[in-house]
Amino acid sequence: MIIDTTEVQAINSFSRSESLKEAYGLIWLLVPIFTPVSGITIGVLVIVWLEREISAGIQQRIGPEYAGPLGILQALADGTKLLFKEDLLPSRGDTRLFSIGPSIAIISILLSYSVIPFGYRLVLADLSIGVFLWIAISSIAPIGLLMSGYGSNNKYSFSGGLRAAAQSISYEIPLTLCVLSISLLSNSLSTVDIVEAQSKYGFWGWNLWRQPIGFAVFLISSLAECERLPFDLPEAEEELVAGYQTEYSGIKFGLFYVASYLNLLVSSLFVTVLYLGGWNLSIPYIFIPELFEINKVSGVFGTTIGIFITLAKAYLFLFISITTRWTLPRMRMDQLLNLGWKFLLPISLGNLLLTTSSQLFSL
């Protein structure tokens, strides 16, 4: 029997090409997953380093300086240490709720990144209800905190969980009303459409100038949702030891630690998207019309410019929130609830009515 070697070679080359196609397909399937995860991880490490450096400057002391140049690897060293810590469980607590709580808190925050546009056509899910999806997802996180506090079987943990739930409900409503006002101005609930609506007039087209009252309410509500000083009542050290985190150690405690900074980064990015023009360069079009659309140039250059502009605006808000944490005293629980229900809620309602009236009269 005579075997045609050319046919065998053709079959082998075809099988190799098919296997290469499968390998490339698998790689391209994993790239959209690992790219946001790596970016978010690096972002959290940078935020932790910035907070330590800024707080050291405010308190006139030396910040982290040993782990890496300027102490930039200190957060990574602390995270590595937490990975090897023992994971303790409360003897009389509900271990299922105790273990599920941190996962619910961090997963709900991670899902919020799916609707954030980091650049022109650079968003994981451009949904028509993007901002409402973020509000719905973020409202799940306090459930995880309440489960953690209840499952710990500790009075301090349970009080912290109850405070977290009450605080979230109090400030979620004004925040939602501010988002509704922005949606009325943009005629859309999509985060991409909201950014595009602000790009018509450059710097002066930002919703910051069209909604100054809503911006102030959104800023305060975002800080309260992130449980940052002066709104860190759920984990007040002087009153509740560490709040709902009291019984946690090891990787579970690390998840709560990471979740707080992830939530802060999400809030900063949504301030950028809703009020600061998103990825747009925002140079006044009267003076330099060529640069006004520079970040919409297709390719790697335009994508890089859009990401850089978005992150630069977000880190400006981060600087404000970090400075606020290390300069203002903590509020009492009654003051916090009164601020949300008696002050921010009526203001946000009035802002929504004014926005609705102006939109109706402009028709």
From Swiss-Prot:
Superkingdom to which the source organism belongs: Eukaryota
One Pfam family this sequence matches: NADHdh
Disulfide bridge map: none
Assembly, per entry: NDH is composed of at least 16 different subunits, 5 of which are encoded in the nucleus.
PANTHER family given in the database record: NADH DEHYDROGENASE SUBUNIT 1 (PTHR11432), NADH-UBIQUINONE OXIDOREDUCTASE CHAIN 1 (PTHR11432:SF3)
UniProt family annotation: Belongs to the complex I subunit 1 family.
Record's protein name: NAD(P)H-quinone oxidoreductase subunit 1, chloroplastic
Phylogenetic placement of the source organism: Eukaryota, Viridiplantae, Streptophyta, Embryophyta, Tracheophyta
